[in-house]
A protein has these predicted regions:
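A short SAM/SAH-binding and catalytic strip from SAM-dependent methyltransferases
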Residues: 98-114
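Gly/Ser/Thr-rich loops at beta-strand to alpha-helix junctions
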Residues: 30-31, 108
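Residues at alpha-helix caps and immediate loop-helix transition turns in enzyme cores, especially N-
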Residues: 34, 114-115
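N-terminal cationic-hydrophobic initiation segments that often serve targeting/anchoring roles
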Residues: 16-17, 111, 123
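A short glycine-rich, Lys/Arg-flanked "PGG" loop and its adjoining helix->strand segment in the class I
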Residues: 116-131
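Class I (Rossmann-like) S-adenosyl-L-methionine-dependent methyltransferase catalytic domain
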Residues: 1-25, 31-90, 131-201
Length: 201
């Protein structure tokens, strides 16, 4: 098992500990271990595997373009338009719905058009005082991982079939710019090329 101590998770849970019946959005796949852990802590959890949804959406768009006769709107659709269209059916939640968001390493995989739009949406669905936990690779990872919670300060990295190509390595300044609307941030640097960022609305 590939388990790492997560100071970011520990602090994320501490920040949410005074919210009764807090709502958490997990942007990874459904893991029973994560669901059980959060339910035992009396949180309500919603899961939306955003990276898989994005991949499936792109595959569907490519197929649609492939079968569209040339001349019938056959030009290549822009990345901006794709991002906009994707978010018409994804991350559809009321404003201030969640007290915490587990974003994992999603931002490393999104393109420059989708990323700010996702960030804008997450900011709107996050309750004031709510927190986002995100992971950033300080170099391209050797393999694609998914993440699940083991306990209050540990996460397990699970090797998985590659869903998307690692798009970028963020510099610290870029991370702060991405989360510019948030009122505070804290970074935890691990020895395994993985940085954790905790961002408070």
């Amino acid at each position: 098992m590939n388990i790492r101590v997560s100071n970011g998770l520990k602090e994320f849970l501490w920040l949410l500990s005074d919210v009764r019946g807090g709502r958490i959005l997990d942007l990874g796949p459904v893991w029973q271990a994560t669901v059980n852990f959060l339910i035992e802590k009396h949180y309500r959890i919603s899961t939306e595997d955003l990276l898989r949804s994005w991949k499936d959406f792109l595959t569907g768009e490519e197929e649609r373009l492939r079968v569209t006769p040339v001349g019938d709107d056959g030009e290549k659709i822009s990345q901006a338009l794709l991002a906009q269209k994707f978010l018409e059916t994804s991350l559809q939640y009321p404003e201030d719905q969640f007290h915490g968001v587990l974003a994992w390493d999603l931002f490393d995989y999104f393109d420059a058009e989708l990323m700010p739009r996702v960030m804008e949406r997450l900011y709107s669905v996050l309750h004031p005082g709510g927190a986002i936990l995100a992971l950033f690779h300080s170099r391209p990872p050797d393999r694609f991982h998914r993440y699940r919670i083991v306990d209050g300060q540990s996460i397990e990295l699970l090797s998985a079939p590659t869903l998307a190509v690692h798009a970028r390595v963020f510099q610290n300044r870029e991370i702060l710019d991405l989360f510019g609307k948030f009122r505070s941030s804290k970074t935890f640097v691990g020895r395994d090329q993985l940085r954790e960022g905790l961002f408070l609305k």
